[in-house]
């Protein structure tokens, strides 16, 4: 059973959704930041459909949790539950361009072939040392702590490399008991370590000049434009909810800068 939701900060409770503990961990860490609901149109707060065959349909729920704070333009969680077909949490923090911060990205995906899991503090301008050095100096030790405890997920496309840091933690895990154990014992604490570092960086961040803010904004737009164009969830969401809804969701909610 799912709950009816009226604003973007209303709780997401989807029966059987495997990533619920991760979302709850993240929301708890945002307490104390004076979060406000982020404007999300009603039709994207929660949608329910069916997938699969006529003889064996699978219920699908896609929900959006989102907020904004003093330093974060948008914090949002795209939550998808489709039984054995898919289970997804895409959790992203988009900072305001008035602060020299990266993006936080957590992508937790379960498909019939296995789990695809990625964590990063993604740079808006990877070649800008002022933007990256203070982040990477603290991120790399956390990355190294967890990297050797997880299988490597494989190389990322060259065109995507400007949007990932050297601390990009990326793995593929099998379905079943082995993968579930690694998710609980390694991936969940790694997710929280990455998020804790991000929130520490944000807490100490000070406003930048208008000129610097404009430079950061251009970098952020390149990132969001790329993500909107290449969103790997597009095919899945289109299959579940149709093309019109999916394109509107990608461009007006997920990557709306």
UniProtKB/Swiss-Prot annotation:
- What does the similarity note say? Belongs to the HY2 family.
Enumerate the Gene Ontology biological process terms: phytochromobilin biosynthetic process
Write the protein's name: Phycoerythrobilin:ferredoxin oxidoreductase
Taxonomically, the superkingdom here is Bacteria
- State the EC number(s): 1.3.7.3
Which Pfam family name is an example for this entry? Fe_bilin_red
Tell me what gene encodes this.
Answer: pebB
Membrane spanning residue stretches: none
- The species is Synechococcus sp. (strain WH8020)
Keyword Kinase on this protein?
no
Protein function: Catalyzes the two-electron reduction of the C2 and C3(1) diene system of 15,16-dihydrobiliverdin.
Reactions the enzyme catalyzes = (3Z)-phycoerythrobilin + oxidized 2[4Fe-4S]-[ferredoxin] = 15,16-dihydrobiliverdin + reduced 2[4Fe-4S]-[ferredoxin] + 2 H(+)
Entry keyword set? Oxidoreductase
Gene3D superfamilies membership? 3.40.1500.20
Which InterPro entries does the record match to this protein? Ferredoxin-dep_bilin_Rdtase, Phycoerythrobilin_Fdx_Rdtase
Read off the NCBIfam families from this record: PRK13249.1
Please give one Gene Ontology molecular function term for this protein.
phycoerythrobilin:ferredoxin oxidoreductase activity
């Amino acid at each position: 059973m799912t709950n009816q939701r009226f604003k973007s900060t209303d709780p997401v409770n989807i029966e059987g959704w495997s990533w619920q503990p991760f979302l709850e961990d993240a929301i708890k860490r945002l307490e104390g930041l004076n979060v406000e609901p982020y404007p999300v149109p009603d039709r994207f707060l929660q949608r329910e459909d069916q997938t699969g065959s006529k003889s064996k349909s699978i219920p699908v729920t896609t929900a959006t949790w989102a907020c904004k704070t003093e330093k974060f333009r948008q914090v949002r969680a795209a939550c998808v539950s489709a039984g054995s077909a898919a289970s997804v949490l895409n959790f992203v923090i988009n900072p305001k361009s008035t602060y020299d911060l990266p993006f936080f990205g957590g992508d937790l995906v379960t498909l019939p072939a296995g789990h695809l899991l990625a964590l990063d503090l993604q740079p808006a301008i990877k070649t800008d040392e002022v933007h990256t050095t203070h982040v990477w100096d603290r991120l790399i030790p956390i990355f190294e702590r967890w990297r050797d405890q997880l299988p490597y997920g494989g190389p990322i496309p060259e065109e995507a490399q400007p949007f990932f840091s050297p601390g990009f933690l990326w793995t593929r895990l099998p379905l079943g008991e082995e993968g579930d154990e690694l998710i609980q014992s390694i991936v969940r604490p790694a997710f929280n370590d990455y998020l804790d570092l991000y929130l520490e960086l944000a807490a100490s961040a000070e406003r930048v000049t208008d000129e610097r803010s404009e430079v950061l904004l251009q970098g952020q737009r390149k990132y969001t434009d790329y993500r909107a164009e290449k969103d790997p969830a597009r095919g899945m969401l289109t299959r579940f909810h149709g093309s019109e809804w999916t394109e509107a969701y990608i461009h007006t909610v997920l990557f709306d800068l």
